[in-house]
């Protein structure tokens, strides 16, 4: 019954879920794009875009299922990439990445761990909710499916991607861990106007 209520809330209005448990791997530096082109089966997306990114081993076996975001560092203006993937397999993937980097000093890799925390909103009212607190235009024309942008949510600097795995309209909002509680309080407060409810992994799995 609880899962059904969570699903109904997402399908009819908007739901909020924590996504910090996913692994976050950051790559930058000369050769980072080429390394990822080699490791992943998909074409690496253009700047400001997201793509699904499976990783295979030499035998063609699936060993990782990621979402990759192509970004520009706000300070250095350097190209960088973030791979979002399984939290359970985070250590295994770290070893794979380091093995392929093989000490290359021009490629910088770091697991972001809990330094980067995330919340996801999904459902037909998610755009209206986000639009009421975002510094950028998040209309369908300006913020397309699989776009990702830096913007302020309220006064909170955030990385926002238009992606969800619920089958509905939705967004992932990533912030430093020090700002997560502030973001949560903002979303839950504003979300009251949109009858927002919380949902968890069981509800998500039933909607995938």
Residue ranges and their predicted role:
Residues 1-208:
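Glycine/proline-enriched, intrinsically flexible loops and inter-domain linkers
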């Amino acid at each position: 019954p609880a899962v059904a209520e969570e699903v109904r809330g997402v399908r009819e209005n908007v739901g909020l879920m924590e996504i910090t448990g996913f692994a976050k791997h950051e790559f930058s530096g000369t050769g980072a794009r080429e390394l990822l082109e080699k490791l992943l089966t998909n074409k690496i997306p253009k700047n400001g875009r997201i793509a699904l990114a499976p990783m295979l081993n030499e035998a063609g076996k699936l060993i990782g299922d990621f979402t990759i975001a192509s970004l520009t560092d706000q300070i250095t203006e350097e190209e960088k990439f973030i791979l979002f993937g399984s939290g359970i397999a985070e250590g295994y993937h770290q070893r794979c990445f380091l093995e392929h980097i093989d000490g290359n000093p021009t490629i910088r890799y770091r697991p972001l761990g809990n330094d980067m925390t995330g919340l996801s909103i999904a459902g037909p009212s998610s755009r209206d909710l986000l639009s009421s607190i975002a510094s950028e235009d998040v209309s369908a024309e300006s913020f397309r499916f699989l776009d990702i942008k830096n913007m302020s949510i309220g006064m909170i600097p955030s990385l926002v991607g238009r992606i969800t795995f619920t089958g509905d309209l939705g967004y992932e909002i990533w912030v430093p861990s020090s700002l997560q509680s502030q973001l949560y309080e903002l979303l839950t407060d504003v979300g009251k106007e949109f009858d927002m409810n919380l949902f968890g992994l069981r509800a998500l799995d039933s909607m995938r």
